[in-house]
A protein has these predicted regions:
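Short, Lys/Arg- and Gly-enriched loop/turn segments at beta-strand edges
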Residues: 330-347, 435-443
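Extended N-terminal export/anchoring regions of large proteins
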Residues: 21, 25, 36-226, 250, ...
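Short, low-complexity N-terminal tether/leader segments at secretion or assembly junctions of large
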Residues: 1-45
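Short aromatic-cysteine micro-motif
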Residues: 159, 163-166, 198-329, 342-422
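Surface-exposed intrinsically disordered loops and tails
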Residues: 143, 283-303, 375-410, 439-478, ...
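Low-complexity, serine/threonine/proline-enriched polar segments
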Residues: 302, 309-311, 319-323, 344-361, ...
Length: 544
């Protein structure tokens, strides 16, 4: 007679798991609780499930007046989020193929990622994984090099996280990465655990050498708080009409430990594009704002209004919620946005709505402006000009990556791993300077210097606190001319926080190599600030 085997029902197994889970939680054993939730995260089927697990774990571990947000974030990212996966990408070097398209390797093979929009939460197989799951926080750097987290997404309100007086950061696990060239291809790989040649992200280590379980990147481009202090949060006008020196001065008002944007952010953002989309550059995948350069004169004049009348065709190019200036040429002939009279009526104001109006039997589109001050307009004289976006444009995107309406239109900021990029203005890096020179053969040279301790960043000069990146010098023949080149490949830099070209040329183009431009303004000497990304209308030259 055959032996009878009684298999437990699914409900019985769930009950046993629940009992075991309750026992571990009741024990109060920190290591056991973290191991339990680590296994639950690895088994999760969606990012929403991981979000729920995070809240559950946090509530179990939080002890009012005892634990801190810093402590729990360190535990979650450093211990709970863990796996043995290796994520990678393989891309052709320009000499091998001019294609910008690579391929996923290792455990990334088969994973699918499609940028999302406000209307659609598209597939992102990476978001739920330990190495890619991300969390928004409100935080501040301290003068001693440490930092303090004041609010945490899913635990505190979004107003406290995104719109407080503090800086909004996005945290992600501090993984180990390695980048190298081999056999005509570029390889980039990421993992949770140490391995030969792998290093942690530089933004996961503070100036004291403390290595954290997470990295922190700003969620938004810098903007002004309601009190006029520079910061990083949602719903803030951009910092423009400003130089490297101006920006450093603005950040120093916030604290001596601040100086501004870091090149480390761009290096990480492009790495996320490469790992998730197997592309050498972001252009054409998540474009960012590269082609939103519009200027129109009023189709009809009015007095005491808060709007500009345009034709229907003109208004169709504008987005409600985007930023504009309103003014005229004054006594001059230039309609450049830097001319003060061009923003004398409204400066960095958002479009509140676009409505149909009929005046004197003629149909117009009224572009209504968020402003407290009414103004007069004159047909053919008053200009309305698009400007860089306020922060938070992509807050409504239903995913980690994408753009509000179209990731490929070039008309709006992009989003990668929950951080906004390319808002329509150059990003002036605080911690990098470029220096022109000439070598012994009479060729032009362009060297890069970095200062990653923002308290030591200077304005206009390279001091002993800066490090020359000896492996990154670009050389241009004495016969070359000023102008745009395109980046064939990025460099595998010794400084892991630097994004810099390995080679630029006129052979590469907007659809090949890294799909990004690099302007060459030849000089025999001189220090230059590092302007990255693009203004409103750089189109094919623009990229991370």
């Amino acid at each position: 007679m055959a032996e009878t085997v009684n298999l437990p029902r699914d409900s019985t197994l769930r009950e046993l798991v629940a009992v075991q889970k309750a026992s571990i939680i009741a024990s109060g054993n920190t290591a056991a609780i973290d191991r339990l939730y680590g296994s639950l995260v690895r088994a999760a089927k969606s990012v929403e499930e991981v979000n729920t697990l995070f809240v559950d774990w946090w509530n179990i571990c939080w002890k009012e007046g005892v634990t801190t947000r810093n402590e729990l974030c360190e535990r979650w990212f450093g211990t709970v989020l863990d796996d043995n996966r290796v994520h990678g990408t393989k891309e052709p070097l320009f000499a091998t193929s001019q294609s910008a398209i690579g391929e996923a390797t290792d455990d990334s093979v088969g994973l699918v990622c499609t940028p999302s929009t406000e209307a659609a939460a598209n597939r992102d197989d990476f978001a739920k994984l330990p190495q890619f799951w991300a969390l928004e926080v409100a935080a501040e750097k301290n003068a001693d090099g440490t930092h303090t987290i004041y609010a945490v997404e899913f635990i505190d309100s979004y107003d406290d996280v995104r719109r407080s007086k503090h800086l909004c950061w996005v945290l992600q696990k501090n993984t180990y990465t390695k980048e190298w060239d081999e056999g005509g291809y570029r390889y980039f790989k990421m993992r949770c655990h140490p391995s030969t040649g792998y290093e942690t992200w530089p933004q996961g280590t503070d100036k004291n050498g403390t290595v954290y379980g997470y990295i922190a990147n700003p969620k938004y481009a810098a903007g002004f708080d309601s009190d006029g202090l520079i910061g990083c949060g949602s719903g803030r006008p951009p910092i423009n009409y400003s130089s490297h020196s101006d920006n450093v001065g603005l950040w120093r008002k916030r604290g001596a430990q601040y100086a501004g944007a870091s090149g480390r952010l761009l290096k990480w953002q492009l790495a996320m594009i490469r790992l998730k989309y197997a592309r050498k550059g972001n252009s054409g995948t998540i474009e960012g704002c590269t082609g939103y350069n519009y200027q129109y004169t009023a189709a009809a004049g009015e007095s005491g209004v808060k709007r500009v009348l345009l034709t229907a065709a003109q208004a169709a190019n504008l987005f409600v919620g985007s930023s504009v200036i309103i003014g005229d040429k004054g006594t001059g002939t230039s309609a450049d946005r830097g001319v003060a009279s061009m923003y004398k009526l409204a400066k960095n104001k958002r479009i509140a709505s676009i409505t149909d109006v009929t005046i004197g039997g003629t149909a117009y589109k009224a572009v209504n402006i968020e402003t407290d001050t009414a103004f007069d307009t004159e047909a053919g004289v008053t200009y309305i000009s698009t400007m860089p976006y306020w922060s938070g444009w992509d807050d409504t995107v239903q995913g980690y990556d994408g753009s509000r309406y179209s990731p490929t239109s070039g008309k709006e900021p992009g989003l990668i791993q929950r951080t906004e990029f390319q808002n329509g203005s150059y990003l002036i890096l605080a911690d990098e300077f470029m220096q022109w020179g000439k070598d012994a053969d009479g060729n032009y040279t362009l060297d890069l210097y970095t200062c990653h301790d923002q308290s030591k960043v200077t304005t206009g000069s390279i001091t002993a606190d800066y490090t020359k990146q000896e492996d990154l010098t670009l050389t241009f023949a004495a016969s070359e001319k000023d102008g745009w080149r395109y980046i064939e490949d990025t460099a595998v830099s010794k400084d892991k926080g630097v994004l810099w070209p390995a080679k630029v040329s006129t052979t590469a183009g907007s659809g090949t190599g890294v799909k990004a431009g690099f302007y060459v303004g030849l000089a025999t000497s001189g220090v230059r600030a590092s302007w990255r990304c693009c203004p409103l209308g750089n189109y094919g030259f623009a990229s991370l």
